[in-house]
Design a protein with these regions (language model features):
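N-terminal Rossmann NAD(P)H-binding glycine-rich loop of SDR-like oxidoreductase domains
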Residues: 7-28
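Active-site Tyr-X1-5-Lys
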Residues: 142-173, 196-202
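C-terminal substrate-binding subdomain of Rossmann-fold SDR/epimerase-dehydratase oxidoreductases
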Residues: 201-317
């Protein structure tokens, strides 16, 4: 009932997370407006509004906000582990400007609520599931230093807006989200879409960056967007909340699952000399369970197998 009759703006409406957010909002009875820039939206529902423009431009951003009650800020520049420091800095500049403009426009347009994505990269390195209140004990891991500090700054900006305006802010810290409509471009893709693409293409040798022992908390995108909807409805109090699966698996396990699902019988070749990131990343999700009633529903094996089938069907068509 919460989303019915409310108009939600989804920034990054043609992207991975934005597409799934829009569909989840439609399924919840909500009205949806997509903000898109250079790409056409994937969703073709005739009830969905589309606003074209550059949200880094103050006028375009404010125009997209008019008449909106809820904002889900899913737009942003992304890069993979192999990107250069200069590429990372360019992405940080874009994302800082974009998020500042979105928060400013939401304030000016007097929207009811906005959901801002932080990230589990804000956390320092730990070997245990990290809680929300452990953020500032140390800086982010060196491999996430720029990106993690950028996301920390997003939280500070959101806190300022929430404390000075009538806009209610929800903050989520997602783990590694995967699923259909992710970015499979080799120059930008993260680990799961990169592995899926190469498995479906039957790459041989099948090279994997890192030792394979790196541990990650992977969350299916459908579970993630469900957590986002719960957060903006139940916890728009500018208090960060981890949204993850709650347990980690090794990259080696992920590789084995993907290769099996793709029917690609080849031994993976792990290369520890190539760029990788933090050895272990898992988050404590007890707050999400307690405050939101959030429980992930899609196990990693089922989610990865479904993703391989989806990508194989898409590339075959």
């Amino acid at each position: 009932m919460f989303f019915q009759r409310r108009l939600s703006l989804v920034t990054g409406g043609a992207g991975f997370i934005g597409t799934h957010l829009a569909q989840a909002l439609l399924n919840a009875g909500g009205r949806v407006r997509l903000a898109v820039h250079q790409r056409a939206p994937i969703i073709s529902d005739p009830s969905v509004e589309t606003v074209h423009g550059d949200l880094a431009d103050p006028q375009d951003c404010l125009r997209a906000m008019q008449g909106v009650q809820l904002v889900f800020h899913a737009a942003g520049a992304v890069s993979g582990a192999g990107g250069s420091p200069e590429d990372a800095m360019a992405g940080i500049v874009k994302n800082l400007n974009l998020t500042a403009q979105v928060l400013h426009a939401a304030w000016a347009a007097k929207v009811e609520r906005i959901l801002i994505f932080s990230s589990s990269t804000v956390y320092p390195a730990t070997d245990h599931p990290i809680r929300e209140d452990e953020l500032y004990e140390q800086p982010p891991h060196p491999s996430y230093l720029g990106y993690g500090r950028m996301r920390r700054y997003f939280e500070h900006l959101a806190e300022f807006v929430a404390s000075r305006s009538t806009v209610k802010v929800a903050l989520v810290r997602p783990t590694a989200v995967y699923g259909p409509h992710d970015d499979f471009d080799p120059s930008r893709s993260h680990v799961v879409p990169a592995l899926v693409r190469r498995a479906v293409e039957k790459a041989d040798p099948f090279e994997v960056w890192g030792s394979g022992d790196e541990m990650r908390d992977f969350l299916h995108v459908e579970d993630f967007v469900r957590g986002c909807l719960l957060a903006i409805e139940k916890h728009a109090v500018c208090d960060p909340i981890n949204i993850g699966y709650g347990s980690a698996v090794s990259i080696r396990q992920v590789v084995d699952t993907i290769l099996k699902a793709a029917g690609h019988d080849v031994p993976p070749r792990f290369d520890s000399s190539k760029p990788t990131t933090i050895p272990v990343r898992t988050v404590d999700t007890s707050k999400a369970r307690r405050v939101l009633g959030f429980e992930p529903q899609i196990p990693i094996e089922a989610g990865l197998s479904d993703l391989v089938r989806w990508y194989a069907a898409r590339t075959a068509s």
